[in-house]
From Swiss-Prot:
It comes from Rhizobium meliloti (strain 1021). GO terms for cellular component: ribonucleoprotein complex; ribosome. This is Large ribosomal subunit protein bL35. GO terms for biological process: translation. Belongs to the bacterial ribosomal protein bL35 family.
Length: 67
């Protein structure tokens, strides 16, 4: 059976760390910041590590060959 292709959209959204965790940008920062709290805006800055079960799903379904 041939190798599964990596999803191009996932390549742009996720990065796998050296320890195997998955990093992604925080959601909810495209528009509508005026009604968000300053804490939300501050916490959503940069990237975050996905929870272990979510990271495993991303790698298995979208990034089978890593990056």
């Amino acid at each position: 059976m041939p190798k599964m292709k990596t999803k191009s959209s996932a390549k742009k959204r996720f990065k796998i760390t050296a320890t195997g965790k998955v990093r992604a940008a925080a959601a909810g920062k495209r528009h509508g910041m005026i009604k968000r709290s300053n804490k939300f805006i501050r916490d959503a800055r940069g990237t975050m590590v996905l929870a272990e079960p979510d990271g495993k799903k991303v790698v298995k379904n979208y990034l089978p060959n890593g990056l």
